[in-house]
Amino acid sequence: MCGVVSFHGLLGSPGNTHGASIKAKILALHGFDDPMVPVEHVIAFAQEMTQAKADWQLHTYGHTMHAFTNPVANNPQFGTVYQPDADRRSWLSMQNFLAELFV
C-alpha cells in the first residue's frame, strides 16, 4: 500500500503502532467542528504519525462537522452536516494526493 486517505475519520489510535514505521503516505481530511473527534485525538494522531516517521498530511476544514462529504447528512445535534465547500476542497485534495502518489 503506497497511500491512504481518510475522509472525516475518527483519528483514534489503534494502539498497535508503537515502534513501527508507517511506509504509506497519509492524508487525513477533517472537519474542525467534528464532535466525534476531540482536539486531543487530532494532536495524538499528529504525534503518532510523526513518531512512526510517516509522510502525513492533515487538512482541517473550518465550520465543518462530521460527514461533511455526505449530501444527505443534516443532523447538527448529532454532529453530522454536509458542507459543500469542504466536500469540494477535500475531493480536490484527494485528487492531488493521488496524482502525487502515481506520478
Which positions does each model-derived feature cover?
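Primarily recognizes the serine-hydrolase "nucleophile elbow" in alpha/beta-hydrolase
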Residues: M1-K23
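C-terminal catalytic histidine-bearing segment of alpha/beta-hydrolase fold enzymes
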Residues: T50-V103
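Short, well-ordered secondary-structure micro-motifs
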Residues: N16-T17, V39, N70-V72
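Short, proline-enriched alpha-helix->beta-strand connector loops that line the catalytic pocket
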Residues: S21-I26, A52-D55
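Acidic catalytic loop of the alpha/beta-hydrolase fold
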Residues: D33-V37, H66
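Short alpha-helix in the alpha/beta-hydrolase fold that links the catalytic acid
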Residues: P38-E48, Q57
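Short beta-strand/loop motif that positions the catalytic acidic residue
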Residues: I22, A28-H30, D34, Y61
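Structural recognition of the beta-strand scaffold that forms the well-ordered cores
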Residues: G3-S6, L27-A28, L58-T60
